[in-house]
Amino acid sequence: SSSGVKMMGETYELDMRMNFAVPAMPDRTDEGKPTFSQAAQAIIKESGVNRGVCVVYGFGSGELAYELARQSDLVVFGFDDDKERVGKARKWLYGKGVYGTRVSVTLVEDMKSIPATGNIANLLVSENILTGKVRPGNAVEMNRLLRPGGGVAILGTPPGVPQGVPEQEIADWLAAGEIKNTKLPGGEWFKVEPGPMADSGEWTHQYGNAGNTTSSDEKLGGATQTDQLEVQWVGRPGADFGIDRQPRMPAPLSAWGR
């Protein structure tokens, strides 16, 4: 200022570009109902997925989503078409201190047409199927949300958990969408594991491959212009992959869908 008094302190830049960490859970998180705690534990163990994006297709009360976040490093997104159910779930999760950071839910008009890009879920579950309330939407839309070549859906009731939607109804639901699945031992549950995306490419070296061809052989799903493409993901977990040193930055690498 004109008086010579310093009005502002030092400016510090906090660069989060290389932070892949998920938001932390509250210091104190209480274990939920045994049904959801046991189910989440079994789902994580059977799927082998404990980090990345989890989609709850048929969100229900939000208690399964909470337990999955509590027992893992997953960021959980849910979809449900019942306004009252979504409102109650949001209020409950907000009280637990996790809503909007590790768990969130979107109210949708139709579970058969989720307003989200596909291929996003490392893990997909359904509380509504677990609790036996309803088979949400259809299996085709569920499968669209799963990441190809590594995504896993676990649907139904694990061993030791009270029965939800009957096994045959889940099997019929999957069969109607022609979704390949595996019946898991014990309980009444199924695993869905989509294979790799057809004609997808890989970028495994600085210049594409060991031959430095600068080509990934990616077919782009047949797209020939930019308006046929869509944004896959924006936000955390994620980073600016450019390491700011020297004149040339290492290329981000991708293999087997990752």
Name what the model sees in each region.
Residues 121-136:
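A short SAM/SAH-binding and catalytic strip from SAM-dependent methyltransferases
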Residues 83-84, 160:
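Helix N-cap at the beta1-alpha1 junction of Rossmann-like dinucleotide-binding domains, i.e.
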Residues 86-116:
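S-adenosyl-L-methionine
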Residues 134-152:
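A short glycine-rich, Lys/Arg-flanked "PGG" loop and its adjoining helix->strand segment in the class I
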Residues 1-59, 69-72, 94, 171-175, ...:
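Extracellular/periplasmic ectodomains of large secreted or surface enzymes and adhesion receptors
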Residues 156-157:
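Acidic carboxylate diad motif detector
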Residues 64-66:
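Conserved SAM-dependent methyltransferase scaffold
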Residues 75-80:
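Conserved SAM-binding motif I beta-strand of class I
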